[in-house]
Amino acid sequence: MRPLEEVDIEVSAPAALTAPSLDTLRALGARIDATPAGVSPAAPSGPARFAATGRRLGEVTAYTAWADVLPDADAADEATVQAATGMMHVHGRRDGAPRGLAVDYAATCASVLSVQGLLAGLLGRARGVSGAVELGTGADRAALLTLSQYLAAANAPEAEAVPSAPGGPPFTSSCGTAFELEALEPGPWARFWRALGAPEDAIRVGWRPFQFRYATACAPLPEPLHATARAVSWARVRQAAASSGAEVCAVYPLTGHPAARSGGPWTVTPRDEPVSAPIDHATPPAALPLAGLTVLEAGRRVQAPLAAHLLGLLGADVLRIEPPGGDPLRGMPPCCTDVSARWLALNRGKRALEIDIKSPAGQSELRELAAGASVFLHNWAPGKAERFGLDAERLASVNPGLVYAYTSGWADRPLPDAPMGTDFMVQARTGVGEAARPVDEPPAPSLMTLLDVLGGLLGAGAVLAGLLLRERAGRGVRVESSLLGAAELLTAPAVHRAAGGRAQRRPAGFRRPLPTADGWLAPSDAASRTAAAVFPTLRDLPTDQAVAALRARGLSATAVTTDLAALPADPRVGAALTRDTHGSLVVPSPWRFL
């Protein structure tokens, strides 16, 4: 049995907000009608609609709009959503000016969130939530969620640990090979550069901006490091990595990545044996769908913590397992009342318990906790769960009804020359660096953590699919999602364009904002050519006047957010942003239950 077996789903336009999830819904067993009567599948505006009806599950409908918290005029499509929410600013930090992502990142995340809402609604119905369920989300809500760590840091009272300035990988060897470098500790970083003959001062100064690039989306590295790379061959770069403990990965083209696996961006595998005891109690009527369920999270960095955070927003009780002394990222600057603003963006509202999972006593304690949990979620390095005796089979022996969730880098599909499964390395290996930039920009992974965040969303979706299957089939379930699945979902439109004989990459200047007298504006994709043609007569105007002039011509456009610290005062979106008890900025939930 599959989670959505015997579930019919009507899907209506716009395609940009629905297409990313159709294959996933089919892989989960749903019967899809993507062209309901009277609905144009190519309609450019929303909201999109996913209406699910299942035997003994009732009806659940998810609506997805471009603008759910932003005014319609400021969130007309992918380009304007990226501009208004600050996504263009964050992606452009490496280059020193706002740049639009050439992939439909906000729309893809919104579509994934819509599927999560459907799964959560159906799960709630199966668990006893009364009445029909309707929920709404938006590409703007999705964008704010993906930017939540950057927004929290920008609006904290402390400064960043390193200055924000243009720069960053990839590096380029003497033969022209662009490559990403990964070193999670200063030792491998220093040994790598010393093996290539880099100056000691540059090695020392470069470590901190390189280390913090995941947090800041930029890395102003000393020029001598780039010069060192340009002076040596790719073969020597690889030798230096092998001898130092660092890892390198060439920036691959999209054509260098094998075909995506069919079946969606995750796997959902039920156990063979049915569970004899009741799985869990029904929720009180009108409660959130996951109320009464416990999620045990042993996550680090972004992917698993974000997945658990989303499950918490849907009502689950999340218990986070931290090492003795607590998660060191709790103190990562900038802080709000001594707690990292970035950490709060992913872990707000979770309970925490310190356990030494490397010790037999800690492993035994964690197994005892798993015996009473509904979900166990982790993103440990490959093989670690087995070494600790905390793999799916071992935990199933203490809790046969457990949903065991692994959010990984490469899933079970190691690619040739695949490096460690971190965000920028997966971007480099899978062609995301090429897809994310138009044809007049050199391929380069975005320093915005595109895959960690989308991978976290997919992890939450996989857990919801597993919980629904467990509820319907009465069996424990193992689910796995990955950064690789996130990369393939994000690059699928480019791959499909190439299969149809069209250009994989977007044209020169695609989603590049237009400069005004005091800032930048972004036209919608549909209005971009006309806006560029008339813009020479408007570029000396202030941004608000230039936007108004374009709108007077019937062209959609909005101002580009270039300062995340100013967003709470921005009348377009400020009312949707709040503060927690620490004073840290909080973005709105990605869902509204109607």
Each model region followed by its residue ranges:
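Flexible glycine/proline-rich, aromatic-decorated loop/lid segments
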Residues: 82, 422-437
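Acyl-CoA thioester-binding alpha/beta core of soluble enzymes
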Residues: 1-76, 83-326, 335-336, 340, ...
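Glycine/threonine-rich flexible loop motifs
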Residues: 52-53, 363, 380-391, 416
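Glycine-rich, N-terminal phosphate-binding loop of Rossmann-like dinucleotide-binding domains
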Residues: 299, 356-357, 379-380, 429, ...
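An anion/phosphate-binding loop that grips the pyrophosphate of nucleotide cofactors and donors
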Residues: 373
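Hydrophobic acceptor-binding patch used for acceptor engagement in glycosyltransferases
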Residues: 376
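N-terminal glycine-rich dinucleotide-binding loop that anchors FAD/FMN and/or NAD(P) in oxidoreductases
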Residues: 83, 336-356, 428
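Structural alpha-helical scaffold elements that stabilize or flank donor/cofactor-binding regions
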Residues: 368-369, 418
